[in-house]
A protein has these predicted regions:
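RNA substrate-binding interface of SAM-dependent RNA methyltransferases
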Residues: 23, 91-183
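Short basic, glycine-rich beta-strand/loop surfaces that mediate nucleic-acid
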Residues: 63-77, 145, 149, 153-157, ...
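Short, glycine/polar-rich helix-capping loops at beta-to-alpha or helix-loop-helix junctions
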Residues: 39-40, 134-140, 203-212
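Structured adenosyl-cofactor binding patch, chiefly the S-adenosyl-L-methionine
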Residues: 121, 142-148, 207-246
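N-terminal positively charged helical leader segments and presequences
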Residues: 1-91
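Short hydrophobic alpha-helical runs that function as membrane-insertion/retention elements
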Residues: 53, 126-130, 218
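Active-site/ligand-binding-proximal alpha/beta "capping" segment
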Residues: 175-225, 229-231
């Protein structure tokens, strides 16, 4: 796809795009043998005058690299949130205490999509990810995020440490999560402008990222496992911040 367009597949993600950003949708692809299904007919009704192509299952599989597309795909312009930069976001006014999510090198697109979906549910102002050595925004991420990737700014940065310093200069407190921290996240006041930093699967936070955090915390673990899936850990930490703010 061209640099300013992307594909989105799966019922939830496609429905969200058609409902919330229909002007960005350029084309709709429907799998031939699914035209009569009610869910597909509902999608087609939402699409209105959007051009529709009916294609084979084989063509759909090729288009989505054999992902679980459920017989429906759209091609759309990237939304404005994809073009927001960190500087403009930090200078914008906040109606509530800002909460950011920073992901340090999450490489699995399914985990990235799940983290973005959780961040959207928690009311996070933006998700910040590195451009290199990490999963980027793609159709798999959009599908797993179920529309959240089109609703919440996801900012890809070239230098994560520099971005953390920019957050600090804007008065944002940086908390990193690591297994060996001496303080539990439940012991910390999260009712302040905050950026929560989560590490990659298995590796955790890089040392340079740890060095740029104001504080390191852990999630208390009672069982034999040493760590949680990053999307699960993200949900625990974000909603602890939300709990404290209510």
């Amino acid at each position: 796809m061209a640099g300013n367009t992307e594909i989105v597949y799966g019922m939830h993600a496609v429905r969200h795009a058609l409902q919330h950003s229909p002007v960005y949708v350029l084309e709709l692809w429907i799998q031939n043998d699914k035209q009569s299904e009610q869910a597909i007919r509902d999608i087609m009704q939402l699409a209105g005058t959007t051009p529709v192509q009916y294609v084979s299952k084989q063509a759909m599989n090729k288009l989505t690299h054999y992902a679980r597309h459920q017989g429906v795909v759209i091609r759309k312009k990237k939304t404005q949130s994809a073009n927001i930069d960190l500087t403009s976001l930090l200078t914008s006014e906040d109606e509530t205490i800002p909460l950011y999510l920073v992901l340090d090198g999450v490489q699995d697109p399914h985990n990235l999509g799940a983290c973005i979906r959780t961040a959207d549910a928690a009311g996070v102002k933006a998700v910040i990810i590195p451009k290199d050595r990490a999963a980027g925004l793609n159709a798999t991420v959009s599908n797993v995020a179920s529309g959240a990737a089109e609703n919440i700014p996801v900012i890809e940065v070239t230098n994560l440490a520099r971005s953390l310093r920019a957050l600090q200069d804007a008065g944002i407190w940086i908390i990193g999560t690591v297994n060996d921290a001496g303080t539990s996240i439940y012991e910390v006041d999260l009712n302040r402008p905050l950026a929560l930093v989560m590490g990659a699967e298995g590796k955790g936070l890089r040392q340079n990222t740890r060095d740029h955090c104001d504080m390191l915390v852990n999630i208390p673990m009672a069982g034999v496992v040493e760590s949680l899936n990053v999307s699960v850990a993200t949900g625990i930490c974000l909603f602890e911040a939300i709990r404290q703010r209510r």
